[in-house]
Amino acid sequence: MAEEPTYTTEQVDELIHAGLGTVDFFLSRPIDAQSSLGKGSIPPGVTAVLTSAAEAKSKPVAAGPVKPRRKKVISNTTPYTIADNIPPEKLPINTPIPNPLLPLARPHGKMTDIDIVTGNITEGSYKGVELAKLGKQTLLTRFTSNEPVSSAGSAQDPNFKRGGANRERARGNHRREWSIAWVGDQVKVFEWCNPRCAPVTASARKFTCTCGSCPSICGECEGDH
């Protein structure tokens, strides 16, 4: 059985001094990532043999050509277009805002107004008054679950829909149209005539005949102003 080696105090101090010198040497210089060895590259076993093999494997890599680093191209263009937060032009105090259903340049027709507070109704056609009453009832009950008392001029009434069947309108080859709007405390119903061949739009517009068989004035629109 071989005897264990013994070291004197001077030999131990010399080994410690050499080890500390090696540590100071590597700490005083930058570490090259290509030549440094991680723990994952040294499998368990005879450390001296495996370490030498790993170092020999890393030397060709260090001696190989160094790839140039790619320069990061910084684009000067903004990827997003930022909208200007310009405040809208403020209207003077008490400036009325036009209702889209009641344009300023509306065609000739009849206007029926009903005041919700007083219940006063301006002069208008029978159908306009009925629709104004329906508009008032709808406005007062729009946030409740109560059913309307009367269906006159309601969605169940075919005459309420623009272009609905009507014998008088069929004779005149005109289509009577209505536009209901709520302006303040008033319900406004505007009515006018359009040729039957004209398209149905959401705004109060006057169209001209395109089929050549519609008269310019019918029995319903001859009294419009």
UniProtKB/Swiss-Prot annotation:
Chain positions recorded as Zn(2+) 1 binding sites: 174, 193, 218, 221
UniProt region (Disordered), positions on chain: 145-173
Keywords: Host nucleus, Host-virus interaction, Inhibition of host innate immune response by virus, Inhibition of host interferon signaling pathway by virus, Inhibition of host MDA5 by virus, Inhibition of host RLR pathway by virus, Inhibition of host STAT2 by virus, Interferon antiviral system evasion, Metal-binding, Viral immunoevasion, Zinc
Keyword Zinc in annotation: yes
Domain of life: Viruses
Gene Ontology annotations for the cellular component aspect, listed alphabetically: host cell nucleus
Region (Nuclear localization signal): 65-72
Alphabetical list of Gene3D superfamilies matching this protein: 4.10.80.340
GO molecular function: metal ion binding
Binding site for Zn(2+) 2: 197, 209, 211, 214
Ranges of Polar residues composition bias in the record: 145-157
GO biological process: symbiont-mediated suppression of host cytoplasmic pattern recognition receptor signaling pathway via inhibition of MDA-5 activity; symbiont-mediated suppression of host JAK-STAT cascade via inhibition of STAT2 activity; symbiont-mediated suppression of host type I interferon-mediated signaling pathway
Role noted for this protein: Plays an essential role in the inhibition of host immune response. Prevents the establishment of cellular antiviral state by blocking interferon-alpha/beta (IFN-alpha/beta) production and signaling pathway. Interacts with host IFIH1/MDA5 and DHX58/LGP2 to inhibit the transduction pathway involved in the activation of IFN-beta promoter, thus protecting the virus against cell antiviral state. Efficiently blocks type I IFN signaling following infection by targeting host STAT2 for proteasomal degradation. Also plays a role in viral growth by promoting host RhoA-induced F-actin formation.
Family named by the database record: Belongs to the paramyxoviruses V protein family.
Quaternary structure and partners: Interacts with host IFIH1/MDA5 and DHX58/LGP2. Forms with host DDB1, CUL4A, STAT1 and STAT2 the HPIV2 virus V-dependent complex (VDC); this complex targets host STAT2 to proteasomal degradation.
Protein name (database record): Non-structural protein V
